[in-house]
């Protein structure tokens, strides 16, 4: 029985690996690796340090993906050969193969996840904004807890988190924060986090220890490259400088060079107060504005598309995507995919890959169903 079952598993692994190879294309990755090596060998490579870092990160991602594909190919081939030569009575070898299959499945699952990241902007860095909802200090503490969750997730991914703007609460937590998450496919992984996150718990700020419900809104945007043209006219901008303010502590870098930019036609406002010079803050704020304007254009196109399709969507800033219940029981549930876990401590410490994976699979399935209709 074990032999028949494991043979079937090895055949399934081969099929899944071939599907992954069709999408990720080892040949294209090999070609891209050569191009990236060529870029890195150019004399002026380090002139733009930000772009140089992006090239290095991309090269690391391509090389790791290629190595995983090569190792998987070897492992599956070895398993296929072992299946053919192992007798049914050799239970020790079958047991060893069972463990090897589990290991191959783990790596294959990682690569399958990458196949869902094929959107035009998925490979980009991501701007992540968290805004506390109504509810005073409790809501601000919840926003801060989410901020820590995403920072821990990014650390585990090897991503860099650059603070762009933050407004601390007077008592605890934060009213809002914007960061730039830098790393390959940061936007692709994080895009499904956009929406409203709801917390239910006994509030540590309530002397009567009552249960409170708090909300925080998460917004995710791709960082826009210079080669993507978003027209921003100087006459459409209102630029103000101000002194960074807040409750002090770890978040606030006191400076007279903070910059706030308002895009007059749309009313979009962005600010940056973390850099030491006004020029740097202005540059970072303009980059963020560009991302917001791009997101606005994409939203308009999406709405137009929905009109043509005759569909209505409830996805938006006010859409609740996930609930985090800490009391009277412990459960975190994604309201779109149905994925849930009772291990709230791990999730709040950045273990959100299962939620990200379930969203990407759910979205791919929805798109497949839509294209078939």
Swiss-Prot record:
InterPro entries per record: PCRF, Pep_chain_release_fac_I, Pep_chain_release_fac_I_sf, PrfB
Post-translational modifications: Methylated by PrmC. Methylation increases the termination efficiency of RF2.
Domain of life: Bacteria
GO terms of molecular function: translation release factor activity, codon specific
GO cellular component: cytoplasm
Modified residues (N5-methylglutamine): 250
Cellular compartment(s): Cytoplasm
Keywords: Cytoplasm, Methylation, Protein biosynthesis
Protein's job: Peptide chain release factor 2 directs the termination of translation in response to the peptide chain termination codons UGA and UAA.
Family membership: Belongs to the prokaryotic/mitochondrial release factor family.
PANTHER family, alphabetized: CLASS I PEPTIDE CHAIN RELEASE FACTOR, PEPTIDE CHAIN RELEASE FACTOR 2
Protein name (database record): Peptide chain release factor 2
Gene source species: Aquifex aeolicus (strain VF5)
């Amino acid at each position: 029985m074990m032999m028949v079952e494991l043979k079937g598993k090895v055949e399934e692994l081969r099929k899944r690996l071939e599907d992954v190879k069709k999408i990720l294309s080892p040949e294209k990755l090999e070609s891209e690796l050569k191009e990236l090596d060529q870029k890195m060998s150019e004399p002026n490579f380090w002139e733009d340090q930000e772009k140089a870092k992006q090239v290095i990160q991309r090269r690391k991602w391509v090389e790791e993906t290629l190595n995983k594909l090569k190792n998987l190919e070897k492992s599956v081939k070895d398993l296929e050969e072992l299946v053919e030569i192992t007798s049914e009575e050799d239970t020790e070898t079958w047991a060893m193969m069972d463990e090897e299959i589990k290991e191959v499945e783990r790596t294959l699952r990682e690569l399958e996840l990458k196949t869902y990241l094929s959107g035009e902007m998925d490979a980009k860095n991501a701007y992540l904004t968290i805004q506390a909802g109504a509810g005073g200090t409790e809501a601000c503490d919840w926003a801060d807890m989410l901020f820590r969750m995403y920072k821990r997730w990014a650390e585990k991914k090897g991503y860099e988190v650059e603070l762009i703007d933050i407004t601390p609460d007077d008592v605890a937590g934060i009213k809002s924060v914007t960061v730039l998450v830098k790393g390959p496919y940061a936007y692709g992984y994080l895009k499904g986090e956009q929406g409203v996150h709801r917390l239910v718990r006994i509030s540590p700020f309530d002397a009567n220890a009552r249960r409170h419900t708090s909300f925080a809104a998460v917004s995710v945007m791709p960082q826009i490259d210079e080669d993507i043209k978003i027209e921003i006219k100087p006459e459409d901008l209102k630029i103000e400088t101000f002194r960074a303010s807040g409750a002090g502590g770890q978040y606030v870098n006191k400076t007279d060079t903070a910059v706030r930019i308002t895009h007059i036609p749309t009313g979009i406002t962005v600010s940056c107060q973390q850099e030491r010079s006004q020029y740097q803050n202005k540059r970072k704020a303009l980059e963020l504005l560009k991302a917001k304007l791009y997101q606005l254009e994409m939203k308009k196109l999406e709405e137009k598309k929905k009109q043509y399709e005759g569909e209505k969507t409830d996805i938006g800033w006010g859409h609740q995507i996930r609930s985090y219940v800490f009391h009277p029981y412990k459960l975190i549930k994604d309201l779109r995919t149905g994925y849930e876990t009772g291990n709230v401590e791990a999730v709040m410490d950045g273990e959100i890959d299962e939620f990200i994976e379930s969203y990407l699979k759910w979205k791919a399935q929805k798109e497949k169903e839509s294209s078939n209709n």
